[in-house]
């Protein structure tokens, strides 16, 4: 593991004025933990074609193969899915744990739970070569196949780092999570889905994705994480330049992610501040009570690329989010047959509520979903009438 000693480089010139304190940060070491509850997820591409130059095990049936890619090993790691019987669900996996290019010398890993359509596997121990010795990591796989449909394999991180970290003079439990499941814990990117995560105990905003900074109890900290997750460095960020953001006054919570980090805001009369820089809207909420005092929440997620915005000094960013919302009705004709190419005599109706940036909207009454909208179909001459209720799914 290579210890970080260089000063953090900053992207936009003049975006923020920070004291040169990164070199003063000290490593705060964390412990590695293994869990059967996977963190993050990433789908692997399955193929029935054997990988070249990989020695394979003797299988009981036609196997599936997949390659897991990781910055920790440029060659990646291959795996083989097999059955304990000649037919049925795939329920054991051979994985190149050591990176020696062989699967025939590996012991297969079995399942922790399974049903008719899926199987979850025991954590697979992976070993990387590090500068200071071997580095251990764990992967969790879940195989899914519904009937004769397409087979899918999902990978999750089965290991994480945790420990007590000094944040502003107070020791707080911290966890580092490999959210993009590539074997490293320090990934930062413009797209939040490509970033790793950090969770701070007692933090009301929960897990955040990694950026240049973390905000804890209203204070900004420069953050640096070891590639293998073994330590974290935090340094109070001084003289952070902020810019104004405006949203409709009905917005009760707003979440954005950008080069600077992952931030949650509770707007006051539709206004709040963020460190200057580029961001993307991640979510928003509207809280409201009806005439009977029942609490309702309208929340948004899954924004398109138009949800990007810039925070600058002296130029407030105005975001048109919130109400009104749009109802989009999609009608499809399901297909059938072995190759799913035979038209049926049925129609499928899908109702989706969305916002201005293509975001999906969800409505909750307390902790429950309200009854779904009703759909009524009537023929032009009125001789046919059909009524049904949409279900969440």
What residues fall within each predicted segment?
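Bacterial N-terminal signal peptides that target proteins for export
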Residues: 1-12
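Hydrophobic h-region of N-terminal signal peptides that target proteins for export
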Residues: 13-23
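Calcium-binding acidic motifs and repeat modules
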Residues: 24-260, 266-380, 386-393
């Amino acid at each position: 593991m290579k210890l970080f000693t260089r000063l953090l480089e900053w992207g936009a010139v003049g975006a923020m004025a920070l004291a040169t304190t990164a070199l003063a940060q000290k490593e705060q070491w964390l412990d590695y933990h293994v869990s059967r509850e996977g963190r993050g997820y990433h789908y692997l591409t399955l193929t029935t074609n054997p990988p070249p130059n990989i020695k394979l095990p003797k299988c009981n049936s036609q196997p599936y193969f997949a390659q897991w890619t990781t910055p920790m090993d440029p060659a990646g790691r291959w795996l083989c899915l097999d059955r304990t019987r000649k037919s049925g669900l795939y329920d054991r996996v051979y994985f190149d744990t050591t990176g020696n290019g062989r699967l025939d010398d590996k012991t297969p890993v079995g399942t922790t739970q399974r049903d008719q359509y899926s199987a979850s596997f025991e954590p697979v121990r992976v070993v990387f070569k590090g500068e200071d010795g071997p580095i251990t990591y764990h992967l969790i796989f879940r195989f899914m196949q519904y009937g004769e449909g397409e087979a899918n394999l999902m990978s999750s991180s089965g290991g994480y780092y945790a420990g007590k970290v000094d944040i502003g003079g107070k020791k707080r439990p911290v966890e580092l999570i490999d959210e993009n499941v590539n074997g490293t814990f320090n990934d930062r990117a413009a797209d939040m889905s490509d970033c790793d995560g950090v969770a701070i105990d007692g933090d009301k905003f929960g897990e955040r994705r990694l950026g240049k900074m973390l905000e804890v109890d209203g204070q900004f900290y420069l953050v640096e994480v070891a590639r293998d997750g073994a330590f974290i460095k935090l340094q109070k960020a001084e003289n952070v330049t902020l810019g104004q953001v405006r949203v409709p006054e009905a917005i009760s919570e707003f979440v954005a992610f950008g080069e600077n980090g992952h931030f949650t805001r509770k707007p006051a009369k539709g206004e709040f501040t963020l460190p200057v820089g580029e961001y993307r809207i991640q979510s928003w909420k509207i809280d409201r009570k009806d005439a009977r005092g029942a609490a309702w929440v309208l929340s948004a997620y899954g924004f398109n690329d138009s949800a990007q915005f810039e925070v600058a000094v002296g130029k407030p960013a105005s975001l048109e989010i919130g109400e009104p919302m749009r109802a989009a009705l999609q009608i499809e004709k399901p297909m059938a047959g072995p190759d799913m190419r035979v038209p049926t005599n049925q129609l499928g109706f899908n109702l989706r509520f969305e916002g201005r940036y293509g975001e999906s909207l969800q409505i909750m009454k307390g902790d429950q979903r309200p009854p779904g909208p009703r759909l009524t179909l009537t023929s032009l001459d009125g001789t046919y009438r059909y009524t049904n209720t949409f279900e969440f799914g």
